[in-house]
Amino acid sequence: MAAKDVQFGNEVRQKMVNGVNILANAVRVTLGPKGRNVVVDRAFGGPHITKDGVTVAKEIELKDKFENMGAQMVKEVASKTNDVAGDGTTTATVLAQSIVAEGIKAVTAGMNPTDLKRGIDKAVAALVEELKNIAKPCDTSKEIAQVGSISANSDEQVGAIIAEAMEKVGKEGVITVEDGKSLENELDVVEGMQFDRGYLSPYFINDAEKQIAGLDNPFVLLFDKKISNIRDLLPVLEQVAKASRPLLIIAEDVEGEALATLVVNNIRGVLKTVAVKAPGFGDRRKAMLQDIAILTGAVVISEEVGLSLEKATLDDLGQAKRIEIGKENTTVIDGFGDAAQIEARVAEIRQQIETATSDYDKEKLQERVAKLAGGVAVIKVGAATEVEMKEKKDRVEDALHATRAAVEEGVVAGGGVALLRARAALENLHTGNADQDAGVQIVLRAVESPLRQIVANAGGEPSVVVNKVLEGKGNYGYNAGSGEYGDMIGMGVLDPAKVTRSALQHAASIAGLMLTTDCMIAEIPEEKPAVPDMGGMGGMGGMM
């Protein structure tokens, strides 16, 4: 086991604070509408330019082990805030730096670190309650666009495209961000349920221009095994043919004689059919087949529940207004499923999201909810170069998370104003313990730091602006983008309450732990012996 370097007291705390400051100073320059970019070197490819706090934080590793521990703890603030709210990482880092700086002074002056932490925790709890009280619901497209553009560093185009996407797929719908092919941002909306399986044979195509198979008012047959024998299918095919309507078959696979017969019938015009594979694998496939069944009003024909393909009737088939099958995707538009059953299914999947542990599972479950509830929107980010696209994509993803958070818990005045107004909750907060009261005062001063940093990044004088904002009431604040004072919500400078709350809670949590640290242990790196020279090889010269 390698030897350890153990350090105590103020000396080690100072090293930890140095690490906090290095990371926080790199992150804080990105805050606000006039925040600067940070350029990050990459091992492969060009440098990465970003204004996203958590991206900057994740890149920082320091040489000194003790400084690095401080930096890593603040990195945790940024990534935790990002996980919970999706934005507000820079605000959280600035708050953590401020609480640590003020708190270390108090600890050095001889105050009890544990009582300071308790005071900080009580102050934060009071601020969070006050933020909930002053939050306003975020319902309109205009407000959603404003939140999006503020989060994307005052890029109004980004806010507008996110608001449009939310309007089209609903607040529950899935919105994904992809690389675009042009210079402009584009929005692509898939209405209805889409899954990533296409036709099993190109002979099913009936729209040569779009290269898709389009079925109007079709029946939908769902089967959870392979179909290779056409005899199993004949009874149901005859019933569909009598009804003179097309048929979509979704099964584990359709192959051999069965597929050949369907193709021949399709080409001759006897019966318009299309066969596709069922989406997903294993248990996820069963669940998705059940989703499609509920959406279209079908029954999944499965031997597990005693149903067989030969005995299937039209009552077991689902229906939809239109289904489009491409080479790689199938889209079901306006399924005939029962609305109450669809809602119950969505509620059931939401319950699974609550209990899911892995991010992958959660993401897949959320996709299923969106497909049942609304649809899927894809924002394609356009840019002139790859470096610009990465930077823009970071901002669009941040803005998307911020708008979701705003819809969830409402909005508060942006630009650091909400935290200043929430301070009113601390004015009458007395703990009956001098050191805990000092902890409350630390938070009271720290909540000014985001506004101070926004003003500093915009080239203003922080103290002058903070005093002027404190003289005002309600949503009165300073718009660093335009240099004006006024009603922040009226000017469209909004922050999601969830983002502000998460930033404050995570910053205080880690900062409190740092203040109560009195010993740090790091591994002493082993000195590697020098590589010996190639002695005795001198005579090689004569071999030429």
From Swiss-Prot:
Changing A106Y: In strain: PID 2. It is an enzyme of class 5 (isomerase). GO terms for biological process: protein refolding. One of its GO terms (molecular function) is ATP binding. Its EC number is 5.6.1.7. Forms a cylinder of 14 subunits composed of two heptameric rings stacked back-to-back. Interacts with the co-chaperonin GroES. This protein shows ATPase activity. This is Chaperonin GroEL.
